[in-house]
Amino acid sequence: MNSTCCSACKVMKCDCAPNCIFAPHFPLTNLETFERLHRIFGAGNVFKILANLDPIQRETAVNALCYEAEALERDPIFGCVGIFNHYKNQLQNLDEQINSAKNELAAIIGLDNVPQYSSIPMPADFLTNKFSLHPYIEKMEGLDEVQKKELMQLPPVDAQVIVNEMFRKRGNIKICGGHGDACASTSGGTSATQKTLPFPQNHNQP
């Protein structure tokens, strides 16, 4: 057997031809990855998928197959769908927390001053590179304060003052919650927490 064969040919115990369809994507150092693919999908099925694609499309297909195989190995029932649902639930919870925070900010600084957050655009190489969150986390951590404010489109207000005011407001609400009439003397006779705001309330809050 050729000592420089790819991991696919090593697993299948065959000679690695110069034009081997697996060689560009499964070097010998990637043996564990192909073993997983072979175990989950079968080497023959992987070959058929790659053979029916243009060479420029194969790297994306290999990345997708590897991701799906790893997901199915971790969760044989749901696979990638289970991962998708997990992160979808996390995003929904974060969305509820953001809306709750917006409500609190609107009560303190006014609805017009609530920051409007922009989404981070998907990188152009997102589908061609092996998926990992670490590079994007490192990029976020490397931003300075000006870049962070530009990304989030923050208004020209002191964020620390807002946070301090929010916690002070929360403290007052907790204190008032146990003293009934002692809290009735607010300006205008209406508590800020009683205002009707356009953001959905988070019913999971204690």
Curated annotation (Swiss-Prot):
Domain of life per record: Eukaryota
Chain intervals for the UniProt region annotation (Disordered): 184-206
Name listed for the protein in its UniProt record: LOB domain-containing protein 35
Origin species: Arabidopsis thaliana (Mouse-ear cress)
Domain LOB: 4-105
Family recorded in the similarity comment: Belongs to the LOB domain-containing protein family.
Family matches, as Pfam families: LOB
